[in-house]
Structures are given as C-alpha cells and as structure tokens.
Amino acid sequence: MSTAIAQQKIRIRLKAFDRRMLDLSCDKIIETADNTAATAIGPIPLPTKRKIYCVLRSPHVDKDSREHFETRTHRRIIDIYSPSAKTIDALMKLDLPSGVDIEVKL
C-alpha cells in the first residue's frame, strides 16, 4: 500500500440538452488527451435527467386540458490519468460548443 504512487487524475463532467453536441465534445476532449500522451477513460454515460413541465392549454378555465413539456439533461464523465502540463494547456485552449456545460476537477 505504501509503495503505490498516487496517480494524478483530471475528472471532466459534461452536461448538455443535445446528446449529439455532447458526444462531439467528448470526442474532442479524448482526442486532445490522446494527442498529448495522456490516458483518457470514457466517456462514461451517466443517467439522463428528465424535467417535465405541466402547462394549462387554455388561458381561462379548462383545467382538464393540459400540455406536458420535458427537458432532458444528458451527462458524461471523462477521466484523464497522468496529465502533463501540455495536456492541461491543450484542454484549456480547446474550443467547445456553448450548449455544453463543463466542470473540471483535479
């Protein structure tokens, strides 16, 4: 246990409403990590969150007539092991779509 060296890890969490845009962003991150000799694990899909909104169709009385809308939040995790300074610089300069929320933990 004492001989094990603590490996440095970067965990990247991605969230988006559009699944295709999320997958393209994951591919860009993994490609960047592979180009800088870091080991990328993922993308690991997490459960999709569904938020349902119930709205009355009529502006006046008809409470029986309702309409349902939903938003789906797709999530992924990517782990990057043994990153170098070059890897971190490349990830900082990476241009990703604005519809993807990125959270990075070291």
Curated annotation (Swiss-Prot):
Disulfide-bond pairs as recorded: none
Record-level GO cellular component terms: ribonucleoprotein complex; ribosome
Pfam families: Ribosomal_S10 (PF00338)
UniProt GO molecular function: structural constituent of ribosome; tRNA binding
Keywords: Ribonucleoprotein, Ribosomal protein
Keyword field contains Ribonucleoprotein: yes
Function: Involved in the binding of tRNA to the ribosomes.
Subunit structure: Part of the 30S ribosomal subunit.
Name used for this protein in its record: Small ribosomal subunit protein uS10
Gene name in the database record: rpsJ
